[in-house]
């Protein structure tokens, strides 16, 4: 039998139906003093390991990976780099909840406040006694309101461009039925919107790619405020209500004065799971904030908090054997 090149210790969880795979042992050392440096080291030297962890036959296109790292910031419990089948994520709300619950499962943390260091900043997470987890996300804001894009298959579509840890194009008027039974059509429509944004050179701030498309509609459940469908990088859809997407939505609601600070927002995802969101204005927290590029955030920047549940599904070892033709995954 061929020897193993790598053995990765992992814990799989799901948050509102969306899976997270936390890699906590066996990964090669990454070069760099900061987590941003380590992200570059990951990208440049070990992208084949991202593919091996995420892609079939060991993973799937829905899975989000979370590489656990020692923190470089003294305030942080751990560092984490999120990634998926398409590449790397600055931040992942459902993934953060999954990581916190997985660490609790390992008895490495208990109920209380914990900080995770991500490439886009420190993220505050609170593990509650009932097992739920609240994530105080990175500063979030609306960049542009009601941007028009012509989608050949759909006509004129308007949406807000907002940052919630990733870049989103948020669309409320789209004529689609947001139901789990309609996922194929929703995926096609959101991919068409994404392609139209690229063709029109419509981007986030500093020409950043808008890699998430989010559709909203009213829900059949009168206990929730909205239902969404989120297309993620790699063309998979988010089973959860999407933590960074809900943060981006809260930023737009705040900018339009449609949601007051600390007022609760119940965001339902396409499979029916719910995140509870709220926010405070960054200025009210007396915080001097700079984005990862070192520039000041806009005046109406918010600090969102997202609360949800995650559940551990598996604890195992991923093995990459030397003679395995698919040790680096099956290209998607």
Swiss-Prot record:
Q: Which Gene3D superfamilies match?
A: Diaminopimelate Epimerase, Chain A, domain 1
Q: Which GO terms describe its molecular function?
A: 4-hydroxyproline epimerase activity
Residues reported to bind substrate: 93-94, 212, 238, 243-244
Give the catalytic activity: trans-4-hydroxy-L-proline = cis-4-hydroxy-D-proline
Q: Which catalytic residues are annotated?
A: 92, 242
Q: Which Pfam families does the entry link to?
A: Pro_racemase
Q: What class of enzyme is it?
A: isomerase
Keywords from the named record: Isomerase
Q: Recorded E.C. number(s)?
A: 5.1.1.8
Where is the secretion signal located? Answer: none
- Out of the domains of life, which is the source? Bacteria
- Bridged cysteine pairs (disulfide): none
What the protein does comes down to:
Catalyzes the epimerization of trans-4-hydroxy-L-proline (t4LHyp) to cis-4-hydroxy-D-proline (c4DHyp). Is likely involved in a degradation pathway that converts t4LHyp to alpha-ketoglutarate. Displays no proline racemase activity.
Question: What family name appears in the similarity comment?
Answer: Belongs to the proline racemase family.
Which protein, by its recorded name, is this?
4-hydroxyproline 2-epimerase
**Organism in which the protein naturally occurs:** Psychrobacter cryohalolentis (strain ATCC BAA-1226 / DSM 17306 / VKM B-2378 / K5)
């Amino acid at each position: 039998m061929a020897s193993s090149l790598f053995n990765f210790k992992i814990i799989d969880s799901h948050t509102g139906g969306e899976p997270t795979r936390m890699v906590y042992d066996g990964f090669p050392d990454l070069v760099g003093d900061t987590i941003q440096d380590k992200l570059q080291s990951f990208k440049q030297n070990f992208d084949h390991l991202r593919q091996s962890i995420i892609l079939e036959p060991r993973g799937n296109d829905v899975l989000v990976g979370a590489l656990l790292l020692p923190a470089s910031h003294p305030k942080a419990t751990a560092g984490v780099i999120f990634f998926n089948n398409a590449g790397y994520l600055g931040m992942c709300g459902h993934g953060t909840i999954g990581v916190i619950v997985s660490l609790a499962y390992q008895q490495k943390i208990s109920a209380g406040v914990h900080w995770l260091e991500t490439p886009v900043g420190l993220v505050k997470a609170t593990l509650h006694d009932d097992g739920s987890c609240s994530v105080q996300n990175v500063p979030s804001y609306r960049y542009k309101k009601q941007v028009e894009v012509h989608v050949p298959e759909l006509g004129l579509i308007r949406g807000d461009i907002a940052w919630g840890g990733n870049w989103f194009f948020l669309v409320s008027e789209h004529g689609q039925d947001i139901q789990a039974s309609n996922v194929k059509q929703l995926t096609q429509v959101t991919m068409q919107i994404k392609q139209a944004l690229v063709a029109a050179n419509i981007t986030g701030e500093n020409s950043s790619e808008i890699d998430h498309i989010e559709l909203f509609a009213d829900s059949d459940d009168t206990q929730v405020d909205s239902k969404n469908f989120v297309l993620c990088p790699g063309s998979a859809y988010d089973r959860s209500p999407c933590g960074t997407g809900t943060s981006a939505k809260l930023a737009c609601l705040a900018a339009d004065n449609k949601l007051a600070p600390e007022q609760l927002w119940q965001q339902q995802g396409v499979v029916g799971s719910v995140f509870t969101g709220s926010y405070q204005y960054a200025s009210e927290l007396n915080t001097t904030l700079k984005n990862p590029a070192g520039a000041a955030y806009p005046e109406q920047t918010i600090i969102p908090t997202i609360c949800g549940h995650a559940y551990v599904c598996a604890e195992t070892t991923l093995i990459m054997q030397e003679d395995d033709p698919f040790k680096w995954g099956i290209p998607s």
